[in-house]
């Protein structure tokens, strides 16, 4: 009988000593992150809400892992940069992931779920399950406020999710030049809090489709906050009469949308652009004479008399008339807001929506929301929700637990590298578990701060199992 040779890692000699490595360390983990994520999750009850939204059709006699454990395991893995479901095959025995899922870390009978289990989960959810999960995200957002806020900004944006196979409802999008999905993300623009998301086919959505989604979200928000001022904000893809009418049906809702130039609107900007061309040329000439830096652009803000025939009412149309060295850059915004000046509407209110794109980048680049490679459209929606849940945990960690620290504004990838990827030796006794972290850890004080805040934070997570 042949004997297996342990897999070794070889390194160049150091100080006359040979150096070898192996994977026989035993109860060691390279991920401290699940313990932090567990603390955040217990505080907000996210995976409890999401799992409760799924109709568990499994026979109780054959259930080894509860639905809440499955959802939490997948979300925690993504939040620790393990976006591939196959990673569960190795991580199911990881002591820290088991401890984060409230299982005994060194008990072989308490191993976590494997990749095939998650494949069955993703492909077993129904459209009704996913709808309830979308509502669970909205409920989590509402619960994140101790009292009804005076105002929230509901930022909406689409994001390209390129597809490379034969996924259901993956269509060619001329704007992006490839086959893709086009998920819709909703965030609260002032805080960065996630509201919900919907995976959409790759074609450009119609106004009635966006309005159908927003109507359900607004209904849930209004049930909790009857008089909160809500401002809908989006780029030119959302300046359609259906969303405008939706805002106008609610006395406490307004909108501010980008507006695409057309054969009627664009000529209205020309007098202002012509004036700014002369001003810009004069400013540049004066700067050159004085040996100063030549101004990059000259811009002014105006309100123009314009109303599209499809609009449900008369709204303010704001123009940014900008002249640059390479030409003109007229931009338009339409809004139902009466009081702010044209400059305030465009510069301070509308341009702030660019932060929404940063939130989407975090979900997409750091938390793999575009890992939608399953053939099933519903399974890919489930994968999107897993990444969104990972974002929620990171956002709460960053804004609540890490507030005032060096990582208060860090992206998820930075938090993962600095806080989550720490070597831990796990020792399990009869009545306790000890976690031994590196003696030379450079973030001891920060880890102490984080764990103490999570330890004393109230938990709304009900007992699972």
Regions from the PLM with identified roles:
Residues 75, 370-437, 445:
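Basic, amphipathic alpha-helical segments enriched in Lys/Arg and hydrophobic/aromatic residues
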Residues 89-91, 105-106, 230-231, 402-411:
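Short, glycine/acidic-rich hinge or "gate" loops at secondary-structure transitions
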Residues 40, 73-74, 85-88, 114-118, ...:
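Short, conserved catalytic/metal-binding motifs centered on acidic residues
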Residues 4-22, 254-365, 451-465:
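An anionic, glycine-rich sequence signature occurring as long contiguous blocks
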Residues 159-161, 191, 200-202, 260-262, ...:
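Short, glycine-/Ser/Thr-/acidic-enriched flexible segments
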Residues 205-264:
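Domain-level cores of phosphate- or acyl-group-handling catalytic modules
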Residues 1-205, 209-224, 249, 398, ...:
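Dynamic "connector" segments at or just before major functional cores
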Residues 40, 341-382, 386, 390-398:
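Short amphipathic alpha-helical "interface-anchor" segments enriched in bulky aromatics
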């Amino acid at each position: 009988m042949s004997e297996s040779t342990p897999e070794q890692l070889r390194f160049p000699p150091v100080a006359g000593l040979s150096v070898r490595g192996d994977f026989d360390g035993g109860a060691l983990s390279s991920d401290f992150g699940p313990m932090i994520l567990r603390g955040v999750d217990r505080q907000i009850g996210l995976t409890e809400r999401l799992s409760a939204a799924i109709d568990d059709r499994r026979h109780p006699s054959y259930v080894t892992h509860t639905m809440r454990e499955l959802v939490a395991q997948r979300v925690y893995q993504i939040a620790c940069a393990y976006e591939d479901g196959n990673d569960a095959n190795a991580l199911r025995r990881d002591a820290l992931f088991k401890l984060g899922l409230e299982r005994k870390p060194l008990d072989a009978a308490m191993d976590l779920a494997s990749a095939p289990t998650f494949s069955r989960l993703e492909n077993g959810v129904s459209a009704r399950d996913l709808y309830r999960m979308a509502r669970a995200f909205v409920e989590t957002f509402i619960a994140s406020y101790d009292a009804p806020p005076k105002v929230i900004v509901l930022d909406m944006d689409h994001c390209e999710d390129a597809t490379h196979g034969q996924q259901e409802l993956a269509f060619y999008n001329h704007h992006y030049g490839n086959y893709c999905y086009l998920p819709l993300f909703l965030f609260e623009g002032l805080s960065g809090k996630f509201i919900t998301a919907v995976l959409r086919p790759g074609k450009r959505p119609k106004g009635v489709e966006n309005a159908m989604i927003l109507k359900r979200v607004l209904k849930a928000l209004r049930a909790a906050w009857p008089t909160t001022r809500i401002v809908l904000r989006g780029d030119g893809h959302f300046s359609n009469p259906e969303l405008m009418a939706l805002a106008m049906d609610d006395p406490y809702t307004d909108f501010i949308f980008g507006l695409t130039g057309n054969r009627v609107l664009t000529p209205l900007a020309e007098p202002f652009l012509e004036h700014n061309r002369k001003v810009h040329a004069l400013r540049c000439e004066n700067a050159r004479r004085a040996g100063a830096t030549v101004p990059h652009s000259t811009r002014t803000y105006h309100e123009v008399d314009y109303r599209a025939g499809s609009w449900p009412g008369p709204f303010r149309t704001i123009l940014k008339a900008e002249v640059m060295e390479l030409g003109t850059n007229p931009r338009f915004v339409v809004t139902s807001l009466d009081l702010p000046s044209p400059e305030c509407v465009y510069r301070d209110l509308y341009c702030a929506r660019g932060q929404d794109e940063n939130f989407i980048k975090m979900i997409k680049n750091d938390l793999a929301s575009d890992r939608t490679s399953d053939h099933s459209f519903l399974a890919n929606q489930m994968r999107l929700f897993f990444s969104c849940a990972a974002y929620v945990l990171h956002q709460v960690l960053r804004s609540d637990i890490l507030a005032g620290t060096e990582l208060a504004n860090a992206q998820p990838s930075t938090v993962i590298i600095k806080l989550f990827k720490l070597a831990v030796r796990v020792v399990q006794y009869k009545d306790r578990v000890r976690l031994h972290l590196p003696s030379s850890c450079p973030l001891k004080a920060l880890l102490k701060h984080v764990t103490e805040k999570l330890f004393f934070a109230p938990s709304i997570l009900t007992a699972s199992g």
